[in-house]
Amino acid sequence: MRHSNSGKKLGRTPSHRKALFRNLAKALLTHGKIRTTEIKAKELRRVVEPLITLALRNDLHARRQAYSVLGSHQLVKRLFDEIGPAFVGVPGGYTRVVKLGQPRRGDCAPLAIIEFTRTVAASEAAAAPAEAE
């Protein structure tokens, strides 16, 4: 029985779930908005919102905790230098999940967009590949 066990299993092993949400969190922090299934978007909030709360603390221990989740120094720098300052004074609710009307072709899965509630300053790292194309 799964009494009081929060979170969805998504038909994956714990290590697969951890890798999935780590990759989705990296994509959201990099692009600011991603399209995924509705359930994954709702579960991703449980990973990303504490990361932004860590960015608001902005101390060495918070950076190390964020690195343990993200595994990328560039993303930790972007999180603490660009994304965190955009949410100063906001008590929570850093992301929004917008349901899309059309389901995914093939398996009819309900889709959603997860994005930040505030606009985040564009980084030079994210802008450089766009200018090169």
From Swiss-Prot:
- List the Pfam families: Ribosomal_L17
Any GO MF annotation of the entry: structural constituent of ribosome
Q: Which GO terms describe its biological process?
A: translation
Q: Which UniProt keywords apply?
A: Ribonucleoprotein, Ribosomal protein
Show the InterPro entries listed in the entry. Answer: Ribosomal_bL17, Ribosomal_bL17_sf
Any one GO CC term of this protein is: cytosolic large ribosomal subunit
Do you know which SUPFAM superfamilies this protein is assigned to? Prokaryotic ribosomal protein L17
Q: Which domain of life is it from?
A: Bacteria
Q: How does it assemble?
A: Part of the 50S ribosomal subunit. Contacts protein L32.
Q: Into which family does the record put it?
A: Belongs to the bacterial ribosomal protein bL17 family.
State what protein this is by name: Large ribosomal subunit protein bL17
What organism does the UniProt record list as the source?
Nitratidesulfovibrio vulgaris (strain ATCC 29579 / DSM 644 / CCUG 34227 / NCIMB 8303 / VKM B-1760 / Hildenborough) (Desulfovibrio vulgaris)
Encoding gene, per UniProt annotation: rplQ
